[in-house]
């Protein structure tokens, strides 16, 4: 795959200063410009800009070379989607979400492997005489990289064609009538586009080292403000990842994430059509408005009104 990662996102919010303060508390590092933030491995991956309501202004995708840009430009032309070329990038707008996507030549992320957690289990004495590493850590949790974004689209089919047939993403899983999980890297998904009555940014996710850091990171945020809790701790069926959803001052969801199941060229997960019942294997309490609904479905309170 010529595409290899999400490079950065530009996120529009009405309260830039508040969301920037939250992002620092979340563990992102201030970068060279005000309201720009970096991850440990991905460099600068978040820019926060003013907007009337929360939205994803731009999504950056990394590719290898000029030939890749040429192929993507031709594919977008076949779809009837205009793009703007620059020396080392091209930009096009997804018709379903209105998000500007900038495909740019950039270095691949090389991540230092996280330390593998050692567990005691029935019949397995992995760490005799020692406490679990996760309970001894004192340092704050810092995201390793941007994991994925989830977008609401008023034309999910058009958005799916844009990312798959235009940009060259691969599909990992689908929820018929609702969503497609698509990847531009070895992660299970980097972009999820779901059908919605309006275009919006549902959430961003940020990778951490292990499930202890999912819990530690979320717990630290909730100690400062319990109302930030949205959904977690849990584990998704799709992607196999542990998660904890939080909400920022723009009422947008952010997710602390342990890495997804992986797709490799020679060892790919089977693509599945999955249903709502398989969203999570186990999960803590859920706040209203987190879970998407298939086209044509209604909540119980909708039917009673």
Regions found by a protein language model. Give the residues of each.
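N-terminal beta-strand motif that seeds the catalytic metal site of vicinal oxygen chelate
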Residues: 1-17, 56-61, 117-157, 188, ...
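Core segments of cupin and vicinal oxygen chelate
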Residues: 1-45, 95, 151-189, 194
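Vicinal oxygen chelate
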Residues: 6-14, 51-75, 77-142, 145-154, 180, 225-305, ...
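The feature marks the first
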Residues: 4-34, 38-71, 77-79, 295-304
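Structured core of small recognition/catalytic domains
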Residues: 157-235, 241-244, 248-250, 254-256, ...
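Short amphipathic beta-strand/extended segments with alternating polar/hydrophobic composition
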Residues: 47-49, 101-105, 193
